[in-house]
Amino acid sequence: MSDVQVHQLYIHGRYVEATSGKTFNSINPANGEIIATLQQASEQDIEAAVKSAQQGQKIWAAMTAMERSRILRRAVDILRERNDELARLETLDTGKAYSETSTVDIVTGADVLEYYAGLATAIQGEQVPLRESSFFYTRREPLGVVAGIGAWNYPIQIALWKSAPALAAGNAMIFKPSETTPLTALKLAEIYTEAGLPDGVFNVVQGAGREIGQWLTEHPVIEKISFTGGVETGKKVMASAAGSTLKEVTMELGGKSPLIICEDADLNRAADIAVMANFFSSGQVCTNGTRVFVPKSRLADFEKAVVERVKRIRVGDPMAEDTNFGPLTSFPHMEKVLSFIESGKQQGAKVLIGGGRATEGELAKGAYVLPTVFSDCTDQMAIVQEEIFGPVMSILSYETEEEVIQRANDTTFGLAAGVVTQDISRAHRIIHQIEAGICWINTWGESPAEMPVGGYKQSGVGRENGLTTLGHYTRIKSIQVELGDYQSIF
């Protein structure tokens, strides 16, 4: 234990002792070892973070947009210089394969920051003439202090997705990472400070339990909450935010997304997409296409192609260069996923491959679940209805286009969807009828910085990334100017 580093809170440009006296551990899910101990924030610490953010935000907002842009661009450069170092830490904390974290997590997060750094100077109002002697103009002003609450599956990427538009618009952010994977958010705070961000503009407060999130959502100074996580927690966060000071919210919640394979689809392409849409990041992606709809006439061939590809997945030590599938992010989550797999078996689904925990050799020490494919699934099964957030694919057969559209939409979620077909007219026809916020045709999973992402139904409120998101970190002030005489009716 003496070799385990203790991490403090990051407030006002430096590490500070938490006042709670409580700590919690970060666990390497590949072997169960403690990799860090973290101090837990108290309500007093949240107050200090808010006060710091208020001070820093005034300095930050007073800078020119070009000055803010330059500082954010410097942070991008540092992120890219330290990509491998950050990726190793992300792998230790999350269990994701280093081959993934080194090429995706930091890379795509830095891309989003670079995108918004470029847009910082493009925040504009408008001027509208009313008559010869009068006009009005608008200003887009920062909200002030905002809060981000992150999820455990993409820690640094989510921290960047939330902080980039907020900071570009002139706000300060208090960020709470998931207690399961909190380490890279602290490194991001260091990088922002090194890049020249004024003290207090990005503070990190970590801790286990719901209290920290509640303190943030109910704090009267905080103007907006951006949350990524589960639906039930999201509902509570949204209710708390509305019940305190009517805060603005962005909610990126769960999904149970349909992937529709059409009868004319190239089978190899369809199988490749289905495997990526279910097993990338060990299945821990909110947009995963876990309900795979296949025409009855293609079902047997498709299942064979999928199983062949799953057999090629390299499960192993996430730090090994050839591993492309690591453990789940925590042992409690592993147990949850395994319980869903057992439910699928009990409800009559057929296991084509996988179906349990990986227990061979060193894998037995970690939170490893084998890539699992179920066939003979029905829409009523728990594995088809509920978000599992693990490496579990459910294959469902269908006969007509009308049928598959209806079944694809028969869910409380609406985050993502995909269609694989060689008929582009059919692709658009289907996608336009699917109730989902992020859709892919003949591909899956890419979320470029320029593309807004978010869900329909209970999968979320608002969007992240893209031009539209920047506007939601500002508020519009309208100013009318009268150049002529003023005439009162009194």
UniProtKB/Swiss-Prot annotation:
Show the catalytic activity: betaine aldehyde + NAD(+) + H2O = glycine betaine + NADH + 2 H(+)
**Keyword annotations:** Metal-binding, NAD, NADP, Oxidation, Oxidoreductase, Potassium
Matching Gene3D superfamilies: Aldehyde Dehydrogenase, Chain A, domain 1, Aldehyde Dehydrogenase, Chain A, domain 2
* Binding, K(+) 2: L246, K457, G460
Q: Name one GO molecular function term.
A: betaine-aldehyde dehydrogenase (NAD+) activity
InterPro entries named in the record? Ald_DH/histidinol_DH, Ald_DH_C, Ald_DH_CS_CYS, Ald_DH_CS_GLU, Ald_DH_N, Aldehyde_DH_dom, BADH
Q: In which pathway does it act?
A: Amine and polyamine biosynthesis; betaine biosynthesis via choline pathway; betaine from betaine aldehyde: step 1/1
Q: Which residues bind NAD(+)?
A: G150, A151, W152, K176, P177, S178, E179, G230, V231, E232, T233, G254, C286, E387
Site, as annotated: Seems to be a necessary countercharge to the potassium cations:
E248
What is the UniProt remark on how the cofactor binds and its stoichiometry? Answer: Binds 2 potassium ions per subunit.
Question: How does the annotation summarize its subunit structure?
Answer: Dimer of dimers.
Please identify the protein, giving its name as recorded.
Answer: Betaine aldehyde dehydrogenase
Provide the organism lineage as a comma list: Bacteria, Pseudomonadati, Pseudomonadota, Gammaproteobacteria, Moraxellales
- Gene this chain is encoded by: betB
